Amino acid sequence: GCFADEYHWKDGIGPKETRKKMINTHWGGVVEDNSFGTHEFFELCEQLGCEAYVNGNLGSGTVQEMSEWVEYITFEGVSPMADLRKKNGHEKPWKLDFFGVGNENWGCGGNMNPDFYANEYRRYQTYVRNYHPDHPVSKICCGANVDDYEWTSEVLKTTHNHCLKELHGNMDGLSLHYYVHPEGWEIKGSATDFDDKVWYKSLNKALFMETLIERHGHIMDEYDPEKKIGMIVDEWGAWYTVEPGTNPGFLYQQNTMRDALIAGITLNIFNKHSDRVKMANLAQIVNVLQSVILTDGADMILTPTYHVFDMYKYHQDAMLVDSSIETETIGVEEEWQVPNLTESVSVAEDGAVHITLTNLSLDKDYEIRTILTDYQVNEVKGEIVHGEMHEMNTFETPDQVRVKEFNEVEKTAEGIRFTIPKCSVLHLEVR
């Protein structure tokens, strides 16, 4: 986040007791002791088995600082930065998958206009070198804040000007940030105390993600019709007023069935636009905003959002299938109407069809009749997350919302038939 453009990576290496301290001016005004630096980050990635995405400091850092960080992380031979890494205890370089050249440079990352940032991007990215041709670093350019389509247009225009066509503006991805604020930016609204009107308003705002992808994607198509540049939605999710008694800068919030629906709706949208959306990062993972995990000392609970992600994991590395669903419009206020259902479908490598659906209604179940073209149904397994809109997991009741089996599916001559309960997210595996 905004901390990236104040972070100086050399403050976070070497013995922890000698690392420089700084004030985290963006988040909480607390002292950052830099105990979690480059080595700790890559150790975490290795333990989790995940790809590494590092964000460089373009706002207040130098080109040399960014270049040396990439060298420190990825260069295997003899060089000042590689030697420093070895001195600090890591002989071999790490694999750096993605590198963001600045973060939110339209705002906290420097308050730049798009043309100025784009020229800075051109300069900085030049020195984000690929030291391993077989493991290239994907460069991520700072994209727009929500519906700032001018930013997207101007950044792409400037980065592509006097640039070889096959280099695609010297970028592999263009970021997009969008959060659901039910009541607006200043007073965002409670994570747990909301009514039917706010429920549908929140889901309506979650659905706006599709408009953003389509409109920014249309601009990207003008410069990149082959879709070589990925849309990187690397900050998304629900953002509420913090829980009472917590530091406003720590962004700690609870997580209810509303968040489960926001997650399911948004993931369905990402799936259906996976030709352009190449990465999407929920903000954030633990104890911040729409978390999948909340902790209290040594205790840990899984949120409704976690369980939705768990059901949707089957789409990963699968093949998107064209799908559509008949819907009706529901809601309380005319301005914030929503479709009653959303879906996405994929086929896994083993031939299994994975269907994910969301029922946005607070009071109505819907019978679903599916037509699976050229597919013989032999077996169906289902799992579901559902409950009353305010239901959540707490440290006293950690399993109030969880994944449950869903077996009420009937095979038909054309496909399958079932009823999806109100306020639910459903995953079906069809073989």
State each model region's role.
Residues 114-264, 326-336:
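Noncatalytic carbohydrate-binding groove/subsite architecture in carbohydrate-active enzymes
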Residues 191, 228-343:
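Aromatic/acidic polysaccharide-binding cleft in carbohydrate-active enzymes
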Residues 5-75, 117-138:
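Aromatic-lined substrate-binding rim segments of carbohydrate-active enzymes
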Residues 45, 69, 99, 174, ...:
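Conserved, mostly hydrophobic/aromatic
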Residues 324-328, 333-338, 358-431:
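C-terminal beta-sandwich/jelly-roll accessory domains of carbohydrate-active enzymes
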Residues 2-38, 79-107, 182-197:
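Aromatic- and acidic-residue-enriched carbohydrate-binding clefts of CAZyme catalytic domains
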Residues 33-41, 76-91, 148-165, 265:
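Alpha-helical scaffolding within the catalytic cores
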Residues 52-55, 97-101, 138-141, 173-176, ...:
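Structural recognition of the beta-strand scaffold that forms the well-ordered cores
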